[in-house]
């Protein structure tokens, strides 16, 4: 294998929404992923897996890539990479990208993946929330029963950080507006949505 591809990580790492590997063909993307595994570079590998997700690759291919990446580079994988294949991930990014806050503050909009596999149909749902805590902290609070939504406490699988990275540290009023509008937009797109109030 040629080691001609440059490392992806830099001082200003790109957001997953920017899709820095979008221009790569399938072979070059596979080569970049193999190199990331060889270097135990979780960030570069995460961008490769993310690109597979956004291209709607075969679910088994994405699950296999996730497993290999976690095995080789667990300590350096960014928190925006989901831990499992999520069929609606491209839709989440596209929908969340339509929302922006103009005023800065300390409130964060976040998404939680919910497990609805026991209900038949789509195995996943989403919870849309807003908090002054980081999304990961707020998820932990939900799971611990602290001011928690029952659906997150019982069915919450993980925080989906990537789609809402640009919706962090917003003014409270803007975050509340975006929370409600994002929940409505995801529901209109056909997803099972909780929260958004």
Feature-to-residue mapping (PLM):
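GIY-YIG nuclease catalytic motif and its immediate N-terminal context
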Residues: 2-133, 137, 177-178
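Structure-specific nucleic-acid interaction/processing domains
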Residues: 93, 99-126, 132-197
């Amino acid at each position: 294998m040629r080691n001609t591809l440059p490392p992806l990580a830099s001082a200003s790492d790109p957001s997953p929404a920017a899709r820095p590997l979008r221009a790569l063909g399938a072979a070059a993307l596979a080569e970049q992923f193999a190199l990331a595994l060889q270097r135990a570079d979780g960030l570069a590998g995460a961008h490769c897996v993310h690109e597979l997700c956004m291209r709607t690759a075969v679910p088994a291919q994405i699950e296999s890539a996730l497993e290999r990446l976690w095995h080789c580079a667990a300590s350096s994988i960014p928190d925006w990479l989901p831990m499992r294949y999520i069929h609606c991930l491209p839709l989440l990014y596209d929908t969340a990208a339509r929302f922006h806050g103009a005023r800065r503050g300390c409130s964060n909009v976040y998404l939680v993946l919910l497990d609805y596999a026991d209900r038949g149909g789509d195995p996943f749902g989403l919870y849309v929330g807003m908090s002054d805590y980081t999304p990961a902290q707020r998820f932990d609070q939900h799971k611990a029963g602290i001011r928690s939504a029952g659906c997150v406490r019982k069915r919450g699988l993980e925080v989906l950080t990537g789609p809402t990275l640009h919706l962090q540290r917003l003014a409270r009023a803007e975050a509340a507006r975006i929370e409600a509008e994002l929940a409505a937009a995801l529901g209109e797109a056909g997803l099972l949505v909780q929260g958004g109030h």
